[in-house]
A protein has these predicted regions:
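ABC transporter nucleotide-binding domains
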Residues: 3-7, 12-153
Length: 153
């Protein structure tokens, strides 16, 4: 079976509080998977661990056969993440903001134009991010997540 995401006994503790407790997942390639639960259930913490933003207290995970922490940078290239309130460099254009992400991920220059096209912002790419409407900022955040067309979104 080909799994895109595998976690084994993934756990995150903060002092005396267990945020994520012993989560083991096997998510197949091509599937749609989401986390549901009340506030404080560990949904965001699990996502932060999978993005490599916080390390698990115990357990392990892999994404597309790449293991954390040794393959952390390769894992980042496999995941497009879209947060609720994305932030941008206000003094840069939409295109320049995406180019910052592109360079960090080591993606080809064409990936910026591809992402702008995907979200319908190609004609606004040279506008300063601070001049974008709320909806345009949301689309720019989505374009950032789609840069390089990652296999995991």
């Amino acid at each position: 079976m080909d799994y895109m995401i595998t976690t084994k006994h993934l756990t995150k503790k903060y002092k005396n509080f267990v945020s994520v407790n012993n989560v083991s997942l096997h998510i197949r390639k091509g599937s749609i998977y989401g986390f549901l639960g009340p506030n404080g259930a560990g949904k965001s913490t699990t996502m932060k661990m999978l993005l490599g933003l916080t390390a698990p207290t115990k357990g392990s995970f892999s994404i597309d056969g790449k293991h954390f922490p040794e393959d952390r940078m390769d894992i980042l290239k496999e995941i497009g993440s879209f947060i609720e309130a994305p932030s941008f460099y206000a003094n840069l254009t939409g295109r320049e903001n995406l180019d910052v992400i592109r360079r960090i991920l080591g993606l080809p220059k064409e990936s910026v134009e591809d992402a702008l096209q995907l979200v319908g912002l190609a004609e606004f790419g040279d506008r300063l991010a601070k001049k974008y409407s709320l909806g345009m900022k949301q689309r720019l955040g989505l374009a950032g997540a789609l840069l390089g067309r990652p296999p995991v979104l």
